């Protein structure tokens, strides 16, 4: 897992940040294949484990060469993924949110704020925020399809109705010609943590 995180420029100095993220050396992908895997707990707002997010890895620390290197475990019948997140850090009054796990880790490392991974655009729209949080920074993916940007705006509007200040933090760089989008992990890898804006909570 350390090799994979390093390949994504994710240098985690605070072990508590990834206390819900673990490495398994031999995880079943299907009936005939096993791979090393980075496995993260997906929890609801009450902190209850709902499912597991698995990233299958190659021995050299990259994503495994399979059709779906990222998967969620099957949900129990009495659970829903809506509102859940991989909770990287415990918020006080300020929380950052992002889509993918690597993006959320990038934000947490660069800004020092806890950042929850909502897994995807739908998860970003539906994530539930603790009552103690008064300011949310939404680190939006920048997609050609506008999916990430629209999800961020949907969350911002919902939080505003709840009396929570939500600020969208957008990637200003252009999307590379060969890519469908760009996110904050791309910024961290290309430019380092100093390329992130300085975030100050508003009280």
Place the predicted regions along the sequence by residue:
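TOPRIM metal-binding catalytic domain and adjacent DNA-binding surface shared by DnaG-type primases
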Residues: 1-38, 43-46, 89, 199-203
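Short regulatory "switch" loops immediately downstream of catalytic or recognition motifs
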Residues: 7-11, 57-61, 138, 170-173
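Generic short alpha-helical hydrophobic face used as a protein-protein interaction/packing hotspot
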Residues: 9-11, 51, 111, 188
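Generic hydrophobic, helix-prone segments enriched in Leu/Val/Ile
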Residues: 13-22, 55-57, 84-86, 152-155, ...
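Short, solvent-exposed polar/charged micro-motifs at secondary-structure junctions
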Residues: 24-32, 63, 176-186
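Phosphate-handling DNA/RNA-contact segment within nucleic-acid enzymes
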Residues: 29-131
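TOPRIM fold recognition
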Residues: 92-95, 101-203
């Amino acid at each position: 897992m350390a090799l994979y995180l390093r390949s994504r420029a994710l240098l985690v100095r605070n072990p508590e940040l990834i206390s819900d993220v673990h490495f398994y050396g031999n995880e079943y992908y299907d009936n005939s294949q096993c791979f090393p895997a980075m496995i993260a707990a997906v929890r609801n707002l009450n902190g209850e484990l709902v499912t597991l997010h698995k990233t299958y890895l190659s021995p050299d620390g990259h994503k495994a060469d399979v059709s779906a290197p990222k998967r969620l475990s099957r949900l129990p019948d009495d659970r829903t993924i809506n509102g859940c997140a991989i909770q990287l850090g415990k918020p006080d009054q300020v929380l950052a949110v992002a889509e993918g796990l690597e993006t959320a880790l990038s934000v947490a490392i660069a800004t020092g704020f806890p950042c929850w991974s909502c897994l995807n655009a739908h998860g970003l729209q539906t994530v539930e925020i603790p009552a103690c949080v008064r300011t949310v920074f939404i680190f939006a993916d920048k997609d050609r399809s506008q999916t990430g940007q629209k999800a961020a705006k949907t969350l911002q509007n919902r939080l505003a109705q709840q009396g929570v200040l939500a600020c969208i933090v957008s990637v200003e760089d252009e999307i590379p010609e060969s890519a469908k989008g760009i996110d904050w992990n791309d910024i961290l890898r290309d430019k380092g943590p100093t390329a992130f804006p300085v975030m100050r909570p508003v009280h």
